[in-house]
Amino acid sequence: MSLMKGKKGLIMGVANERSIAWGISQKLAEAGAELAFTYLGDALKKRVIPLAEKLNSKVTFNSDVEKKEEVVKLFENIKSEWGEIDFVVHAVAFSDKSELSGEYLNTTRENFLRSMLISCFSFTEVAKEASKIMEQGGSLLTLTYESTKAIPNYNVMGVCKSALEASVKYLARDLGAKGMRVNAISAGPIKTLAASAIGDAKFLYKWNEDHSFLKRNVDIHDVGNSALYLLSDLANGVTGEIHYVDAGYNKVGMPDPKNFS
């Protein structure tokens, strides 16, 4: 497949082979895209570089989205390497694990602000810098999770994702005049490193499997396929969208009574 042949893009947020960002990376590489990757610190460097090499990528950067100067430097480095960029995948999020369980009411100011900076505002900052080296037809994609409802053990991350989804719409408006598209994928629960921080995750997976329309959970390859579409020219008319990849769960009105019999 050569859907992405000649296109270059940045992947932010790969942690290991179970990462949603890795599933997206594989599909993009299979379609002919040339990829660059970010990591944070030596521990992730040891994981990310071998994965990048599997996709014939030698372009990797250490970058901390908490620091504005590092985001600016990241895209300066990409400009030096490639000149221009066609797409960015933002799969970056953080919250103190201890504050995901219990009541949202007990979220600390420090964790709220840090979680919002990393999980939400970083996408706006990335979009701003990426747009400087992105030609018309460029595309930005971020990852979210069911933010229209209150999810147990998700707390401040749910609030961050709500803000992130609002950011997608405003960024789509701002960048649309330049021919750039901005979208998000809202995936169902997937067994990733990030998801392991959510309490009662096994119940979440089982509930989604039992009550989604397709009666299964999605995986990183399902998300990768949708990301490929959204980042490719096939989605030239699509922007500002929250695209659900959750086996239909977000459209469930109430569970089927047969599942409780």
How would you label these PLM feature ranges?
Residues L228, T239-S261:
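Short C-terminal tail/terminal secondary-structure segment
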Residues S2-F37:
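Canonical Rossmann dinucleotide-binding motif of NAD(H)/NADP(H)-dependent dehydrogenases/reductases
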Residues I49, V156, A177, A187-S212, ...:
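A glycine/serine/threonine-rich, flexible loop-to-helix segment
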Residues G13-I20, A93-K128, K132, Q136-K178, ...:
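Catalytic loop of short-chain dehydrogenase/reductase
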Residues G176, R181, V238-G240:
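Short, small/polar-rich loop/turn modules that mediate ligand/substrate recognition or access, typified
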Residues S212-V223, L234:
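A conserved structural motif in NAD(P)-dependent oxidoreductases
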Residues R181-K191, L231, Y244-D246:
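Conserved SDR Rossmann-fold cofactor-binding beta-strand/turn motif
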